[in-house]
UniProtKB/Swiss-Prot annotation:
This is Putative uncharacterized protein MJ0821. Belongs to the archaeal ATPase family. GO terms for molecular function: ATP binding. It comes from the Archaea.
């Protein structure tokens, strides 16, 4: 999936991934906003995806 106008977000996630892991980050947004696909595009490592208050 190609993201449009998401360069800022992708670059931020990539800078987090490349740095020393010392914080917990959350990616949140409305249903079907592309949270999961954004993590896939950046190869973001995650353990639990929380969407709209529901654990999936």
């Amino acid at each position: 999936m190609k993201f449009f106008n998401r360069e800022k977000e992708i670059n931020k996630i990539l800078s987090i991934i490349e740095g020393e892991p010392n914080l917990i980050y959350f990616i949140y947004g409305s249903l079907n906003s592309g949270k999961f696909n954004l993590t896939e595009e950046t190869q973001f490592i995650y353990s639990i995806v929380v969407t709209d208050g529901l654990f999936s």
